[in-house]
């Protein structure tokens, strides 16, 4: 078990990391998309050097890499640990003011001095957290547990390994920028991250072990109109907003995020922007099954073609589809040790593994596309990307315990 001083260190690390404003910018053309990510990267470089890691580097893209050699000649495997620097652009991450609740007694939690609160009426998982120390927001920003809890857990595990001289395998560490917008991982230096397999520490509830994720793409549909004074518009105006609203009606009403779960895919209208003369709709396309994923992309393409044929527009609507990431399972299944080791580590510290698909993506999906198996491990956090985000300190401790147990590389 982790000592009290280590629990304090873990909390202090987390509170320090969330003080960095690292929100990524979705329309950025370069990485890192925000200055704060580089600042946090430089801070982590300094701490990794202090912990005695080797080859600690920060690239111009704010990718942090480091290496800790095995301290036991019998432990020859190399395991990677990955977490990301940025926070979601979907909710403000500036001036995060965490609040620590010792021994949560149940019931609603008021956030700051405003009207925001977290209630077990809406979030049933809170009933499992009674008696634990919770870190919440003040109701004005997200918390940043996604993924600074993961960073704090990795750093604390490394600190304990070094202080207590615990036998461990070779360890590679990477902290990446712009995971939330799928940008930074494209600048990942694979040549500096040679390992047998790796883990992203980017999951949620205690026990989560994830090695299947969505296939993902983004579709942008552009509509072009013609504006004229409304008093004289008959037979002359073409309203791009109206065209876009009509097009949106072709999508299946039940195949949306708010009506699907498990391994069921969806279309998600993420953004609707523009005016009478030009509108752009942005859709997220998600599915676990590769064939269904291809069919979803074909569906949008076919609907655009039908819409253009039906309307006979002088300037037809345009479609752009960009793949984001792929399901990692096809790679992970060929490295079953990556799942077995995480399973054994959780059981060794009294945690029941919960294998579940990720209804999203991680940096591990990209690493898998490069041939590196990279399952995802829990952080103890909940309600990511929102003002209701929270993390359990005990859950974070559990993650540290699992990381240390995995790095012992027993029976490999």
Swiss-Prot record:
Active site: 86, 179
The record's free-text note on cofactor binding: Binds 2 Zn(2+) ions per subunit.
Compartments, as annotated in UniProt: Cytoplasm
GO cellular component: cytosol
Domain of life the protein comes from: Bacteria
Required cofactor names: Zn(2+)
Family matches, as Gene3D superfamilies: 3.30.70.360, Zn peptidases
Disulfide bond entries: none
Residue positions binding Zn(2+) 2: 146, 180, 385
Binding site for Zn(2+) 1: 84, 146, 202
This protein's UniProt keywords: Aminopeptidase, Cytoplasm, Hydrolase, Metal-binding, Metalloprotease, Protease, Zinc
GO BP annotations listed: peptide catabolic process; proteolysis
GO MF annotation terms: metallopeptidase activity; tripeptide aminopeptidase activity; zinc ion binding
First and last residue of the signal peptide: none
Assigned EC number: 3.4.11.4
Pfam families per UniProt: M20_dimer, Peptidase_M20
Function: Cleaves the N-terminal amino acid of tripeptides.
NCBIfam families registered for this protein in UniProt: peptidase-T, PRK05469.1, PRK13381.1
Sequence similarity: Belongs to the peptidase M20B family.
Name this polypeptide is given: Peptidase T
Gene label: pepT
